[in-house]
């Protein structure tokens, strides 16, 4: 796996009345991607951004828009976010009983596919799906709120995931760390 990395700041802490300034700060800071945290106040205890925000961002940036859905029933939001301009859509393994159908749906919408897991979810839960995804998002905090402390055991999970990807010729799969 390459040591290259992508810088993908979240707009979750941005001033939502001035997202243009947030995009400018991201660009001037060297961001490669714009990370959009989507929360539904059901899967996690917070409510954030919907497809209309992504739709308003799309004409203002050429950056890769990375949507991280922390929602129940993610299949209901895939198409709206794809149509709004998302380049990548990540869903949580814990939010669905049928990961394969969500992966296929995201791909059919022309987006890159990410799969994520909460800190206490075993890495083994996502292994059967890694051949079909473009990235794995490892949560290093409990999802739902910004400003939490990094969970140190996340380092071991990241190393374990990297080893698995390398040993299984899946080094094209990106590892994303959130938190």
Predicted regions, residues:
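Short gly/ser/thr-rich secondary-structure transition/capping motifs
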Residues: 116-120
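Conserved N-terminal beta1-alpha1 strand-loop-helix module at the mouth
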Residues: 1-90, 95-98, 105-108, 112-113, ...
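Short beta-strand/loop segment that forms part of the nucleotide-sugar
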Residues: 175-178
